[in-house]
């Protein structure tokens, strides 16, 4: 992705742990909203994010809906399954 996201854009974050929480807070200060995708109920980042999707990494339907709700996607941690990224990459910049 080479274009900058305009303020107000939604950043999708794969993983809702402490790093996702800190990223959400920093993004909000810059005028962005964050949407978390995490299989765990009530992830730490969920308290500060604009939206949360709770679904399995293998749920292609939930991943596609998540991609449709965000403008770009980033990873909170390095162990996101490659199959999940394979679903997301054709839909949004990762």
Regions found by a protein language model. Name each.
Residues 1-94:
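ATP-binding N-terminal substructure of ATP-dependent carboxylate-amine bond-forming enzymes
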